[in-house]
Amino acid sequence: MRFLAIAALVCFAIAAPARAQTPDAELMAPIQKFIDAFNKGDTAGAAATHAAGADLTIIDEVPPYLWRGPKAFQEWGAALDMDAKKQGMTEPMVTMKAPTRTEQDGDQAYVIVPAVFTFKKAGTPMREAAQMTFVLKKGASGWLIHGWTWTGPKPTPASGATKP
């Protein structure tokens, strides 16, 4: 019986590192570059991480909620800017955690990352936890984002937030 318990512990110890493996850095690079560029307000840098083809698709909580095609990124950015002005949003920032799921089949990949969007709304710090789901394809220039979604509940005042 003791042998079985030790064998089970060894199996768990060997399996644990396999579950904790980090995704391919090359696969994650365009996602991280997109978020970094977004946080800096670098629209061109963020757009460069996305494919500019007919299959580019973005789904976000900002009206009209869905953008498709070669100009999807630019149209989404314009809608986001317009909504931010309408809502009195400033200081947008997205942070990501390690992916909770990655699937790769040759030159195509699917990645889910937990994300948090923080901003100020009329001066009040806000926080919105969500998940971002990405579809990427690898071409001659490397991995590019071909689609993504933002999914989560509505933002709430950040912990301890008070109006200015």
Model-predicted regions and their roles:
Residues 34, 46-47, 69, 73, ...:
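Hydrophobic pocket/interface hotspot
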Residues 86, 118-127:
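Short, cysteine-centered beta-strand-loop-beta hairpins and adjacent loop/turn segments enriched
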Residues 9, 16-49, 156-164:
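Short, low-complexity N-terminal intrinsically disordered segments enriched in polar/charged residues
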Residues 110, 127-160:
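Short beta-strand edge/turn micro-motifs at domain boundaries
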Residues 47-104:
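A solvent-exposed, acidic/Ser-Thr-rich amphipathic alpha-helical stretch
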Residues 93-94, 106-115:
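A short hydrophobic beta-strand element
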Residues 73, 96-102, 115-117, 131-137:
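Hydrophobic/aromatic beta-strand elements that line small-molecule binding cavities or substrate pockets
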